[in-house]
Amino acid sequence: MFHNFHILSLSSYAYNLFFASAGMLSSLVMFFKFGLYELFIFTLFSVLFISFAWGKDIAMEGLSGYHNFFVMDGFKFGVILFVFSEFMFFFCIFCTFFDAALVPVHELGETWSPFGMHLVNPFGVPLLNTIILLSSGVTVTWAHHSLLSNKSCTNSMILTCLLAAYFTGIQLMEYMEASFSIADGVFGSIFYLSTGFHGIHVLCGGLFLAFNFLRLLKNHFNYNHHLGLEFAILYWHFVDVVWLFLFVFVYWWSY
């Protein structure tokens, strides 16, 4: 019987990703509580590996002609819902931040940021990271417009991936040199929760871009059919916008 839906073949990726994600969240709690980071690193890479394997299968389905326009509309709606859920996640984090910052309690000295904390200078490493991330947004947009014009976008994609890796490296360096930890009161908790989860999103977004760059090298995309790359670019711009809010409020306004 003819229909517009693509009937999926049997796959264990959904179950594997569920258990790997549950293990990652559980190991994250253990890391916060006991400082055991090895299991978290293992489960994080398990999630990334399963996601790449699943994405490869989806890409092969598209190349085989199973993804008609009706199916692609479903993908678009799913990605919009996913980005909206990510937006709500960071919205909750910012609600927590403003609840603590606008009405600081007596235990914090009734001031924000808490008295006695040596914070990161926003016009040092954070400003550099802002320039790097915004530059990566420019280069990935350059790559997109080059592809739409049926031109080569290899150099701009390589530059975007390098900037993403550079941002992650500088963020790790900032954590190692910071004078406070996640256990230093409400500010330390919110700071590392917000910037840490954003860093994970940058890592995932950079890998997503790298995955699509490999597909680009294999000629999986053309100027009018590159949905996977568009999803990666949309996600990357979302990461850019979240960082701007983090820089303005968590770094600059709190300093």
Curated annotation (Swiss-Prot):
It catalyses: 4 Fe(II)-[cytochrome c] + O2 + 8 H(+)(in) = 4 Fe(III)-[cytochrome c] + 2 H2O + 4 H(+)(out). It is found in: Mitochondrion inner membrane. InterPro entries: Cyt_c/ubiquinol_Oxase_su3 (IPR024791), Cyt_c_oxase_su3_dom (IPR033945), Cyt_c_oxidase-like_su3 (IPR000298), Cyt_c_oxidase_su3-like_sf (IPR035973), Cyt_c_oxidase_su3_a-hlx (IPR013833). One of its GO terms (molecular function) is cytochrome-c oxidase activity. Belongs to the cytochrome c oxidase subunit 3 family. Component of the cytochrome c oxidase (complex IV, CIV), a multisubunit enzyme composed of a catalytic core of 3 subunits and several supernumerary subunits. The complex exists as a monomer or a dimer and forms supercomplexes (SCs) in the inner mitochondrial membrane with ubiquinol-cytochrome c oxidoreductase (cytochrome b-c1 complex, complex III, CIII). This is Cytochrome c oxidase subunit 3. It comes from Caenorhabditis elegans.
